[in-house]
UniProtKB/Swiss-Prot annotation:
Gene3D superfamilies: P-loop containing nucleotide triphosphate hydrolases. It is an enzyme of class 2 (transferase). InterPro entries: Adenylat/UMP-CMP_kin, Adenylat_kinase_CS, P-loop_NTPase. Residues 30-59 are annotated as: NMP. HAMAP family: Adenylate_kinase_Adk. NCBIfam families: PRK00279.1-3 (NF001381), PRK14527.1 (NF011100), PRK14531.1 (NF011104). This is Adenylate kinase. Catalyzes the reversible transfer of the terminal phosphate group between ATP and AMP. Plays an important role in cellular energy homeostasis and in adenine nucleotide metabolism.
Length: 181
């Protein structure tokens, strides 16, 4: 099972990815974890990414693409993976398509976790993180919307929407149903 998980910050992608990862026996690959691992191990890509992160800039797609390429080629991802936070743009989606083609495989689908923005704000404020103010959260949601909206058209033939409002178990049941599992 090779899936891309889309959804705004606070939609519960990470939570659902952890459950689906265990259920399907495939790794949950998040770009945040990839960045932390590469930086922590001081890989060439990690050193390069750290320069951008330390400067408060977005890590260029070329670096992120290379990290994802290396990660999905690892043995534990041979039977599938769940990508969380990647791709974020059509450019990255095209890169992913090329990466998978080189591995002689393709995506099985794209799950889009759909949740009302006011609920996301409520959820994220409830986490109590100092940097999670309503303005910051709404800005993150705007950036997400602007960045990823073209992906919905790009993946129009393989995207399935999942209502991400409700208890974790309910959302998971909907995700499994959407996948036909």
């Amino acid at each position: 099972m090779r899936l891309v998980l889309l959804g705004p910050p606070g939609a519960g992608k990470g939570t659902q990815a952890a459950i689906l990862s265990e259920k399907f026996g495939v790794p949950h690959i998040s770009t945040g974890d990839l960045f932390r691992a590469n930086i922590g191990q001081a890989t060439a890509l990690g050193v390069e990414a750290k320069k951008y992160i330390d400067a408060g800039e977005l890590v260029p797609s070329s670096i992120t693409n290379d990290m994802v390429k290396a990660r999905v080629a690892e043995p534990d991802a041979a039977n599938g993976f769940l990508l969380d936070g990647f791709p974020r743009s059509v450019e990255q989606a095209q890169a992913l398509e090329g990466i998978l083609k080189d591995l002689d495989t393709r995506l099985d689908g794209v799950l889009s976790f759909v949740v009302d923005e006011d609920i996301v704000v409520e959820r994220m404020l409830a986490r109590g993180r100092a940097d999670d103010t309503e303005d910051v959260i709404r800005n993150r949601l705007r950036v997400y919307r602007d960045e990823t909206s073209p992906l919905f058209d790009y993946y129009k033939d393989s995207i399935v929407s999942v209502d991400a409002i409700g208890e974790v178990e309910e959302v998971n049941a909907r995700a499994l149903a959407a996948l036909g599992k």
